[in-house]
Amino acid sequence: MRINPTTSGSAVSALEEKNLGRIAQIIGPVLDVVFPPGKMPNIYNALVVKGRDTVGQQINVTCEVQQLLGNNRVRAVAMSATDGLTRGMEVIDTGAPLSVPVGGATLGRIFNVLGEPVDNLGPVDTRTTSPIHRSAPAFIQLDTKLSIFETGIKVVDLLAPYRRGGKIGLFGGAGVGKTVLIMELINNIAKAHGGVSVFGGVGERTREGNDLYMEMKESGVINEKNIAESKVALVYGQMNEPPGARMRVGLTALTMAEYFRDVNEQDVLLFIDNIFRFVQAGSEVSALLGRMPSAVGYQPTLSTEMGSLQERITSTKEGSITSIQAVYVPADDLTDPAPATTFAHLDATTVLSRGLAAKGIYPAVDPLGSTSTMLQPRIVGEEHYEIAQRVKQTLQRYKELQDIIAILGLDELSEEDRLTVARARKIERFLSQPFFVAEVFTGSPGKYVGLAETIRGFQLILSGELDGLPEQAFYLVGNIDEATAKAMNLEGEKK
């Protein structure tokens, strides 16, 4: 990554030759600015509005140029609230896109979309900044190695394994556990993972951001006593932020992750919660920018915007970015343009099901709806592949039999089908697992289950060795030995 050195002399002369414009129109978060002829800023340049409002309060609003309208006008989207701005106010063209601090000094800190620290710990100790708009790495730089990323979550590791250096999507409607699953993945992976992580909070609840920060301090991922030893940088643009901030905060987080990958040559984890809010923010400003709405009211540039973000999240020969993204599914409709566009970019999808959440099976991951390009015998091995397929077949058969059971009852099934149903119900319960981050709600200590243990457990259920155990023994346990111990306890309680 090239960082152009600037001497103090040229910086002074650049300030003297400031390109000034004036606000001509304000429509919510969108501003029209008039510049002198021949002095038009480039698209994506940052503009700064400084001044005082009618009450004398200081105003400092950064905007990003989106369109050149002709007649010496540009249209820009504000990154913070436009309250107090008036027509005729002076606007400064910075002559460059938004740039944010990057490098080791960002670890342990919380930033907003502009790269300004918001954690009251003082300024960031770095001179190195990077623009948030960059092109994706060239095809020849990409790394194509295939390896599994173990998460310690049974349902994920067995049925839809994650790729190291890949892109993973967690799909689900409101309240089915996307953020809890992301927090568990941060807990299991970021703690064990030697490299660094970047968390981009895009348009989600402020409370969740605060909880995550507190939890990271408790677990030592953020080291309060020595911030430099922290392992994560946090970038937040919450629900209450204007759409401009929510639209760009994902790029700010990605820029920080890219620096660790390209310059420090590290393996980076990038968590984004929630990628749908990035699309939603784009659709909010799209109409104000004069674009005709497309399907379901989304912006016509949906695929382009998503592609420009996702194509930068990749692994190169220098280092890797493994990205885990939560994707809100409006009205539980996976064919909605926002989740449907996201699907195309992912190596693995973890689909959360409201039906399983209603049954109390957590994580509520749909074992039949979740997919992964990694579930191939040449990558995961014959044994893993075969057991995953048999688990899916058993669950699929159970799903087909549910209508018959509902109408005629279990007794009308053949002996073979009854056995399939009994094993499927055990598998369904064994796919649940107590989470470390949910200990407060469940009262059960969290469990990390290695891949070998997971495969052994499902092998035993499918082989019929555990047919005599009650199905409730398999609910919310870690490995299979805990299930057999729980069955003995249940037996003892009955006596």
From Swiss-Prot:
It catalyses: ATP + H2O + 4 H(+)(in) = ADP + phosphate + 5 H(+)(out). The keyword Repeat does not apply. GO terms for molecular function: ATP binding; ATP hydrolysis activity; proton-transporting ATP synthase activity, rotational mechanism. It is found in: Plastid, Chloroplast thylakoid membrane. One of its GO terms (biological process) is proton motive force-driven mitochondrial ATP synthesis. ATP binds at G172, G173, A174, G175, V176, G177, K178, T179. Keywords: ATP synthesis, ATP-binding, CF(1), Chloroplast, Hydrogen ion transport, Ion transport, Membrane, Nucleotide-binding, Plastid, Thylakoid, Translocase, Transport. GO terms for cellular component: chloroplast thylakoid membrane; mitochondrion; proton-transporting ATP synthase complex. Its EC number is 7.1.2.2. It is a peripheral membrane protein. PANTHER family: ATP SYNTHASE, ATP SYNTHASE SUBUNIT BETA, MITOCHONDRIAL. F-type ATPases have 2 components, CF(1) - the catalytic core - and CF(0) - the membrane proton channel. CF(1) has five subunits: alpha(3), beta(3), gamma(1), delta(1), epsilon(1). CF(0) has four main subunits: a(1), b(1), b'(1) and c(9-12). Produces ATP from ADP in the presence of a proton gradient across the membrane. The catalytic sites are hosted primarily by the beta subunits. Belongs to the ATPase alpha/beta chains family. This is ATP synthase subunit beta, chloroplastic.
